[in-house]
Amino acid sequence: MISEFVFSAVHLKVDHETQRRSASCIWCSKVCGFILLLVFIVASYVLSSERKTLLFAPYLMEEDLSEDALRDVVRSIATKVKFRARRVPDVSELMGLEEHMFSVVPRRFLPDLKNPCWFEELHGDVSADPYGSNLFGRSFRQIQLIFEQLSGLFRRRLTRRDGKLQRLRCLPYFYIIGQPKCGTTDLYERLRLHPDVRLTPPKEPHWWTRKRFGIVRSGERPHTRFPLDHYLDLFDPVALQIQQSLLGNSSSNITSEASASTMWDNNAWLYLHGNSTGAEPPSLVQDLIHALQPDARFIAILRDPVERSEVTGVLIPNCVCVQVRLQVGLYVVYLLDWMSVFSRDQLLVLRLEDHASNPELSMSRIFRFLRLGALSDQRQRQISKRPASNTRHPSDRDLGPMRPITRELLTLFYAPFNQRLAEVLQDESFTWDGRSEHT
């Protein structure tokens, strides 16, 4: 409508001055009327207390495929699903890809510490701010404030060993690796309450999968890479606490991070190598972590992938044109990759459904897995009774349920992957058909 007004105004040629003014006034009044109407529509939507429908629903073309045809397509995909073992690179290949990383992290960690830590020799001016150039500090205000506090303590925490100034450096003892929208935040916040667990922001640095390649946000092209030293700086608050406890010759404190992309996101290779690496990347995140931390432990919490898709807020009624990350729900594909380098007892896989229904049992399993000390009854109740974190916002629920045909197609699509997951974990509850060994 606006384009019609514009073109009519451009091509309007009237010699008489009065006619020109009249036409101009008419054009302006139409445009103003249109804008006023648009503002009224938007305002009425924004002021609505429900907002249960989209403001502008896309035009739905008459379906060319019947629901039966769609079911047949999904079933045909399921028949082609095959699980093949991947080629695991050897350490020499990894060292060629990440030479600096292997020069920073030693092959052995300090023996009297539960958390993987080591002393790093300092070079250059020790009076300079060691965190001034840290890219995490520039990206997160909260981290910047922490770094400012650490900078004031930096020289005091240096130790002299073999005549050289050194600082204590640490990596996480365990990682919460996924999946998105499956309860990682709730696990993280409950673990924070254990006296032996020391967690620092951010919860999700996404360094292994994204920022070390220069990807700040998912889907963006790479920019400036975040060095390993900047990642290690995030754990300096914990390193300081562990160093203080070393006065007692040992420390049981551990730290972690919970980037929900660690389990599945290897998309950075597309930017770095394109299609030149063949059918799969030359190495995955887990290969590097295993080479550096062969004894690391990992927690993955999963939910019914159909429900996970709905919670992401993209599969909503009247909207069939939004990109969906279906691959995130292919849990077994990623789990098999992790099990190609780490043993089964280093991976704890939970279901969100079980965790939500019985958090006390779920957290007890996690504490045993991490070999954490016993808790008082009061602290145990505090952890298990803590309100759930990062639950679905009420306004998201107003979008309504998933369309029945969408749910059915997703169930068909994920079925062979869920079945294989249940076989790998020897637990039928991971088929998400209502059975569970843990509830």
Question: What residue ranges belong to the model's regions?
Answer:
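Short glycine/proline-rich turn/loop motifs
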Residues: 159-160, 164-169, 264, 313-321, ...
